[in-house]
Swiss-Prot record:
It is found in: Cytoplasm. This is 5'-nucleotidase SurE. The gene is surE. NCBIfam families: PRK00346.1-4, surE. Nucleotidase that shows phosphatase activity on nucleoside 5'-monophosphates. One of its GO terms (molecular function) is 5'-nucleotidase activity. Its EC number is 3.1.3.5. One of its GO terms (cellular component) is cytoplasm. It comes from the Bacteria. It catalyses: a ribonucleoside 5'-phosphate + H2O = a ribonucleoside + phosphate.
Length: 250
């Protein structure tokens, strides 16, 4: 299978390199278009006020296009202009840090997959539930083996399959669960700090309170040690509320 690979952690990130190697070893052809720099939590941002520049990375058996832009830029430019062949599947990841619940709105990883889906491609987002993953080569091999089992024929158009791996050894994973995303939200705060030169700055912190996470949702099952699989479609219409606002019509 021909696969286009991207991420939001950057083209040199360990997660991308791990899944690249695993997909190649599984017999797939992999074309990489990924950001040159760290782009975590940029959401679905698109560069419109400056040109996009591209750097080719070719080292130790790895080859890919590095884009000085966002993950969405990578997909828009890569799938329309850079890649000579259309992929059968787009994979975004493996991200350092889970993308569950409200993370999905902020995630450059999920946004890259979403952009690919909007362009008519089958797309998967892969994430690992640790911001400092060590060796995830075994998880990458597991993901490479899991991807061919997705039954795309039964899924609607522009659907993204969001897959998250727990931060446990592969042999300790309890299984795979298809589940909804949690509706719990981040409780954020900013730490006010002073730099060595006396300047003031702020640093974001946050937590999703465990008691707000409903059982059977992606965050809950991931914490329990399951691989979570959540199909996503980005229609933000609140259908239940449409009729309540009908009085606004003239």
């Amino acid at each position: 299978m021909r696969i286009a690979l991207t991420n939001d952690d950057g083209i040199q990130a360990p997660g991308l390199r791990a899944i690249y190697k695993a997909l190649i070893e599984a017999g797939h052809t992999v074309d990489v278009v990924a950001p040159v720099t760290e782009q975590s939590a940029v959401g679905h941002a698109v560069t419109i006020a400056m040109p996009l520049r591209v750097k080719v990375f070719h080292e130790n058996g790895f080859r890919g296009h590095g884009v000085y832009g966002t993950p969405t830029d990578c997909m828009k430019l890569g799938l329309s202009s850079l890649l000579e062949h259309k992929p059968e599947l787009v994979v975004s990841g493996i991200n350092a840090g889970a993308n569950v619940g409200p993370d999905i709105l902020y995630s450059g990883t999920v946004s890259a997959a979403t952009e690919a889906a909007h362009m008519g491609y089958r797309a998967v987002a892969l994430s690992y539930d640790s911001f400092r993953p060590e060796d995830i080569s075994a998880h990458a091999r597991h993901a490479a083996a899991l991807l061919p089992h997705i039954e795309w024929a039964g899924l609607p158009e522009r659907c993204v399959v969001n897959i998250n791996y727990p931060a446990v050894p592969v042999e300790s994973i309890k299984g795979v669960r298809v589940c909804p995303q949690t509706r719990a939200v981040w409780h954020d705060w900013y730490e006010h700090r002073t730099d060595p030169r006396g300047g003031s700055y702020w640093w974001l912190n946050g937590v999703i309170p465990p008691e707000t996470v409903a059982p059977g949702t992606d965050r809950a099952l991931l914490t329990e040690g399951y691989i979570t699989v959540t199909p996503l479609r980005f229609d933000f219409t609140d259908s239940e509320t449409l009729t309540r606002l009908a009085s606004l019509e003239e």
